[in-house]
Swiss-Prot record:
Homology family: Belongs to the UPF0312 family.
Parts of the chain that traverse the membrane: none
InterPro entries linked to this entry: Lipid/polyisoprenoid-bd_YceI, TTHA0802/YceI-like_sf
Protein name per the record: UPF0312 protein SA2479
Species the sequence originates in: Staphylococcus aureus (strain N315)
Name of a matching Pfam family: YceI
Highest rank taxon of the organism: Bacteria
Upper lineage: Bacteria, Bacillati, Bacillota, Bacilli, Bacillales
Amino acid sequence: MTNFTFDGAHSSLEFQIKHLMVSKVKGSFDQFDVAVEGDINDFSTLKATATIIPSSINTKNEARDNHLKSGDFFGTDEFDKITFETKSVTENKVVGDLTIKGITNEETFDVEFNGVSKNPMDGSQVTGVIVTGTINRENYGINFNQALETGGVMLGKDVKFEASAEFSISE
């Protein structure tokens, strides 16, 4: 069994969504945690739970961030966390239950396992993964949108994300 200690200082969770049919808005969730258990040498044994604090959303625009925290989007007063619980893990895919605003759907995401390295600062063993994927926000009750007079809509329904997580590990 491998002991995993999440290193939030060296991890990130970023997203992007199409805006006005012509560009993308990017942002991040600045507060999240990932708990992992299992054997790093046997992916089939790995179980992980990610917990994201949606009120930590950061698009570098306070007014937009406040709107994203409102009931039009994440409803952070009522729904204070987003969770992802794995069902299966392979070297390049993860399947699990994603819960946003109390709505749970099974999702499959791509995984890039980056091996194990020794941290020269403290001698600890570290590992990291990058998880990428796309979710349909409307599947989670995030339906806010506005029609554009030129056709199309203000916001795309697909949200792309990249999560990079680093862990100290020990046996």
